[in-house]
């Protein structure tokens, strides 16, 4: 006798007869409630752009972080439950520092994503990593950086699946943004074009009017460290779109 759907819903480690893990599927749905984030990989570097939802005029916009630095050569954009993202971000930062201390070299973007996805998969285990949770993480991440292979962009979802992308959108308006990215992206795209395209797409999908306080923008270029755009720099870029 099969259990009812609601009983499969409650078990994070139980497959349904159709071979589905409902809790993981629900975690992926949680991403669709998050703010929109876009990552674009070019030969000149990677750009990450994220919408910041300012729900009250009394909120301090600078306190909302949607793009963070993992290491000098890697940045990460997030969408979904930000509290869940903090645990994964901490894991990524510890891994990059341990790698540096152990091997005296910077960690590749793929290796960082792999380390974080391993933690994302450990939900519900009794002897899991101390950072693991009793449920799947309700957050999707875009890791953008530069390593010996050049500029790299990786997308990771709550199932622990990660994949390299040329351009990727996550969050509430990801479907519309992804189809727009497919139209504008080309292999010879410059970083400047990528920045402009990502902001134009954000402008199209955001409910609020795009300005320097309700978006975040960061780039990572070969030979240069992770750079988060200041409010003044954002205003300059927004003028052009």
From Swiss-Prot:
CDD domains under this entry? proteasome_alpha_type_5
Q: Which residues carry this modification: Phosphothreonine?
A: 55
Q: Out of the domains of life, which is the source?
A: Eukaryota
Q: What induces it?
A: Up-regulated in colon cancer cell lines. Up-regulated in fetal Down syndrome (DS) brain (at protein level). May be the target of the transcriptional activator NFE2L2.
The record's Pfam families line, in alphabetical order, gives: Proteasome, Proteasome_A_N
Q: Which SUPFAM superfamilies match?
A: N-terminal nucleophile aminohydrolases (Ntn hydrolases) (SSF56235)
InterPro entries cross-referenced by the UniProt entry: Ntn_hydrolases_N, Proteasome_alpha, Proteasome_alpha-type, Proteasome_alpha_type_5, Proteasome_asu_N, Proteasome_sua/b
Glycan attachment residues as annotated in the record = 198
The protein's predominant localisation is cytoplasm
Question: What is the protein named?
Answer: Proteasome subunit alpha type-5
Q: What is the lineage of its organism?
A: Eukaryota, Metazoa, Chordata, Craniata, Vertebrata
User: What would be the name of the gene that encodes this protein?
Assistant: PSMA5
């Amino acid at each position: 006798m099969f259990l009812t759907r609601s009983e499969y819903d409650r078990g994070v480690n139980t497959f349904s007869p159709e071979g589905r893990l409902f809790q993981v599927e629900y975690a992926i749905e949680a991403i669709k409630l998050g703010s929109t984030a876009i990552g674009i990989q070019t030969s000149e570097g990677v750009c990450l752009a994220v919408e910041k939802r300012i729900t009250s005029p009394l909120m301090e916009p600078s306190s909302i972080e949607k793009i963070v630095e993992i290491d000098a050569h890697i940045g990460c954009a997030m969408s979904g439950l930000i509290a869940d993202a903090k645990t994964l971000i901490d894991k990524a930062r510890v891994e990059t520092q341990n790698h540096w201390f152990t091997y005296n070299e910077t960690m590749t973007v793929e290796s960082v994503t792999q380390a974080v996805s391993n933690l994302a998969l450990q939900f519900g285990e009794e002897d899991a990593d101390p950072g693991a949770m009793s449920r799947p993480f309700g957050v999707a991440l875009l890791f953008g950086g530069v390593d010996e292979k050049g500029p790299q962009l990786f997308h990771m979802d709550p199932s622990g699946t990660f994949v390299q992308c040329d351009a990727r959108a996550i969050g509430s308006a990801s479907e519309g943004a992804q189809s727009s990215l497919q139209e504008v992206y080309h292999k010879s795209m410059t970083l400047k074009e990528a920045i402009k395209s990502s902001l134009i797409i954000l402008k199209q999908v955001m409910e609020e009017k795009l300005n320097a306080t309700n978006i975040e923008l960061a780039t990572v270029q070969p030979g240069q460290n992770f750079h988060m755009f200041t409010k003044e720099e954002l205003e300059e870029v927004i003028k052009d779109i």
